[in-house]
Amino acid sequence: ISANVLNMTAMTITTKYQRAQLRINLDNELTKWLTLSTKINASRTHSHNGGIDIMNFLNYSPTMEMKDPVTGVYNMDPYNSVNGNPYGARVANYGDSYVYALNTNMDLTFKIMKGLTLSVQGAANYSHVPSYSFTSSLAKPGQLSGMENASRMNLFWQNTNNVTYNTSFGDHHLTATAVFEVVPKAEI
């Protein structure tokens, strides 16, 4: 069992990143004929104003007037860039994105008789990725204020069943396996 928590303020202004994660790996011999193996990974991440356009930052004139003193709108660079003011984009706009994820796997292995096993495996992957953003009319000249909300969810699961027979006779070894697998198409 392990866990980690990360809470950091990034190198750029108004940027923050948080992550919490829990991982569990358990292998248990429940009886002489049954083994249970479980793997679980759960996490949550949050990014506030993540991602920057580094080329836009590097191309902007370092000595230009940042804001129009009358309107409060962040000025465009008149010489080096056709993009909006990167500083204005950082301080006037707002964005949050999250990732909630759960990955699980379980295996029940039945020892039916000497050399014969049945493995019943199940796995599921779930993710939910909501994001929210606000674009301010102060970020650059002519910019309209706007908001955006988005959400994406995925759920995938799988069931795999293996029957395996292992035996040796003389100088020979035989392994025979039969597999049945179900992988549905999931849309959320």
What are these regions (language model features)?
Residues 10-17, 21, 25-103, 119-188:
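Surface-exposed loop/interface segments of Gram-negative outer-membrane beta-barrel transport/assembly proteins
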